[in-house]
Amino acid sequence: GISALMLSLYNENDKQTQLFRQAGLTLLYNHEWYEHTPLARAEWIKFFGALLDKQAQADSIFEQVKHDYLKYQQLVKDSVKRKKSILTGSSFMGTWYLPTSATYMGRLLIDAGATFYNDKNTTNASLPFTFEKVLLHYKDADVWLGCEAKDKQQLLEKDGRNAWFKAYKTNQTYNFYKRRTTYTNEDGGTIVGGNDFWETGVAHPELVLCDIIKVLYPNLLPEYELFFTEKLD
């Protein structure tokens, strides 16, 4: 039978967790999602390495990831003279959550050589914006990354005001859907499954970093093919 169960720690006192404890299970908490830098999240592979008695292999994988990440970060520092501005994400139920310099995505953007409105803010959380405030501060952003849309038409269907952004007008809109799973149900409809951006992307932030660099400064990585990212048609 099961002797231990791994959970993400959102609320250790929730009813489900209490039931697991009453059943005598040992609970292990994966706290990777709470880390605020890409390499700190990736380093959780060492936790799994220790659990599976593969610590040396886990350490080796992480050291390679770290080496590659720092290499591309340095490439940007050495090569980028004029940084491009970037907008990320999309409005959700009237609110747009945007990264600061102290968030996971914010750190990736800075390391890729991007600038954004909150890039000097050190709050350890994404900040809520109204659409109007996003438009005020990001209307002229060079690139829009992580759009929640499969194409530009869907982006307009979600909110016609999205056409007001410079990145929309200049065809610099991108999503993270390249490795998203979709299924067709028996009625012929499309069901959206998981997105490998939130799985492999956590373990391999160097790939996410390269995607962002490629979008911002394609000449820096001429042979690189986008891994998680797609340009909206």
What does each model-identified segment do?
Residues 195-211, 215-216:
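Flexible loop/turn connectors
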Residues 1-39, 51, 55-202, 232:
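Binding-cleft/active-site segments that stabilize strongly anionic ligands or cofactors
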Residues 207, 216-233:
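Extracellular/periplasmic juxtamembrane helices and adjacent flexible linkers that interface
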